[in-house]
Each structure stands twice: as structure tokens, then as C-alpha cells.
A protein has these predicted regions:
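C-terminal alpha-helical interaction appendages
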Residues: 1-73
Length: 73
């Protein structure tokens, strides 16, 4: 299922803002991390209706992905 592009962009913005606040990152860096994440690709491609999940859940998922990627480097 494909979400409305405008609503999806707003969801991306909310997730990025929450992620930046939780990780104490500048918004531009948080946005770059988000757009290079697996989470973004899944949401963009409409996999498993990820866009239907709550902002909090998706932000936590992004934090987990960020920390696992950070540790792998």
C-alpha cells in the first residue's frame, strides 16, 4: 500500500525531529541518517505498511538501527 506522499513527508519530518532530540543530533545530521536508513527504504517502498506504525515506534526503530550501525563501524 502506498501512502499519500505529503502525509509521508510529514511523518518523515516528525520521526527525524524526534530522533534528533533523542540522540542530541543537529537536524541536518539526523535527516541524513534517516534518509540512509533501512527504515526509510522500507517506508518509502511501502513494505509491511511501516508508515502506519506510530511515530514513537518508528523513532525507536531508527535509534536501534543507528546504534547497531554505529557499533559495527
Amino acid at each position: 500500500m502506498n501512502a499519500n506522499p505529503i502525509l509521508l513527508q510529514k511523518k518523515y519530518a516528525r520521526i527525524t525531529e524526534k530522533f534528533a532530540a533523542l540522540e542530541n543530533l543537529p537536524l541536518d545530521k539526523a535527516l541524513g541518517i534517516f534518509y540512509h536508513s533501512t527504515l526509510y527504504r522500507l517506508m518509502r517502498d511501502g513494505v509491511s505498511d511501516m508508515h502506519c506504525m506510530s511515530d514513537e515506534y518508528l523513532t525507536e526503530d531508527l535509534c536501534r538501527e543507528y546504534h547497531s550501525t554505529e557499533q559495527a563501524q
